[in-house]
Design a protein with these regions (language model features):
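Hydrophobic alpha-helical bundle cores within soluble ligand-binding/oligomerization subdomains
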Residues: 1-167
């Protein structure tokens, strides 16, 4: 016979505190005080990433600089590409990204917390490259070039996925 547990469960328990997001303080989910619905409608991926990392929405100059930074961090080390080539074609893309970021962390060790912002931006920049490199190699036997002139993450992803500039 099992005993039925009674009570509030975890209701009212604080699991942690963060300034990144809130739920319910301003009608639903917010990132750094900005309603998620407005961000989804009006902001780009890079603007939201900047907001989460730097605690403010970027002005145009800051956004241009941030996009340029991410663009410079997109390429993958050859040793990571070799690992991605070994992942089966039927793997789930989330598993590929987990393996890719884990391997990248071993290749480019963070060392200490003074490098954490660079490591975070490197991971953000490489996610489209990791999953697309694996996909193109495992499904089409193509060893693709990950460098292009697209300034946005979405543009970069679409360009390397389809092999041409997005329209």
């Amino acid at each position: 016979m099992t005993k039925k547990l009674e009570g509030a469960g975890l209701r009212g328990q604080v699991a942690g505190e963060t300034s990144l997001s809130t739920v319910g303080q301003i009608e639903g989910l917010a990132y750094r005080g900005h309603k998620i619905e407005l961000l989804a409608e009006k902001a780009t991926f890079e603007e939201v990433a900047y907001l989460l990392l730097y605690d403010k929405l970027p002005n145009q100059s800051e956004l241009d600089g941030y996009k340029s930074l991410l663009k410079s961090l997109r390429d993958l080390p050859d040793s990571l590409k070799e690992v991605l080539k070994k992942i089966p074609a039927d793997a789930h893309p989330m598993d590929v990204m987990r393996t890719g970021t884990s391997m990248l962390g071993n290749i480019e060790a963070e060392g200490d917390f003074s490098n954490q912002l660079h490591a975070i931006n490197r991971m953000i920049a490489t996610m489209p490259s990791i999953v697309t490199y694996w996909y193109k190699f495992s499904h089409e036997d193509l060893d693709i070039d990950l460098v292009n002139d697209e300034d946005s993450m979405a543009g970069h992803f679409l360009h390397i996925l389809h092999g041409e500039k997005p329209s």
